[in-house]
Amino acid sequence: MRMNEPVDAQPAPSFLPMSRRFRGYLPVVVDVETGGFDWNKHALLEIACVPIEMGADGRFFPGETASAHLVPAPGLEIDPKSLEITGIVLDHPFRFAKQEKEALDHVFAPVRAAVKKYGCQRAILVGHNAHFDLNFLNAAVARVGHKRNPFHPFSVFDTVTLAGVAYGQTVLARAAQAAGLDWNAADAHSAVYDTEQTARLFCKIANAWPGPV
């Protein structure tokens, strides 16, 4: 050992820190449940976010989930067929829905904290058909005039593409099963369940990919 070499010297990690892994962006998985397909006229009803964390070994894992049910914004429509698919009961006594501004504050706060924790510049939305989620999110942000949206306004990581490349599957349920993840069809179309499963899928694919060093 050389005279000036620290006794506890460790080899340099063979992976990039989160702040550099995705050009300064922190992946955050988002899923929304809505009153239809048109973000300009249909209501946002549920949202969930899961920041992606990085362990000491450089492997990714899902962080804590933040979620909210939303009161439909005034003037927006809800297609009854969408409620049949999601199973959302708008007047359920335990739905505890928040107004859009309050709901966005609730889910954005832990995202901003995770961005700061990893020294990233901002969050980048990860989703399955990600621009659907981003468009509804951006529409809600615009409606309430939210000034602290942590997400990139148009860039995304789409697990449809990632799963298509990795497993040859583009449907979330089939992609999750191809990745060796459990899938419960009864829980699907809940923003929390779909977000958490998408986060697991993203981590499975990202951890299998030899990232830049």
Curated annotation (Swiss-Prot):
The record marks F37, F132, F154 as: Important for substrate binding and specificity. GO terms for biological process: DNA replication proofreading; tRNA processing. SMART domains: EXOIII (SM00479). Residues 28-202 form the Exonuclease domain. The keyword Mitochondrion does not apply. Mg(2+) 2 binds at D31, E33, H189, D194. It holds the Pfam family RNase_T. Mg(2+) 1 binds at D31. GO terms for cellular component: cytosol. Keywords: Exonuclease, Hydrolase, Magnesium, Metal-binding, Nuclease, tRNA processing. CDD domains: RNaseT. Binds two Mg(2+) per subunit. The active form of the enzyme binds two Mg(2+) ions in its active site. The first Mg(2+) forms only one salt bridge with the protein. Its cofactor is Mg(2+). Its EC number is 3.1.13.-. One of its GO terms (molecular function) is 3'-5' exonuclease activity. The active site is at H189. Homodimer. Belongs to the RNase T family. This is Ribonuclease T. It comes from Xanthomonas axonopodis pv. citri (strain 306). The gene is rnt.
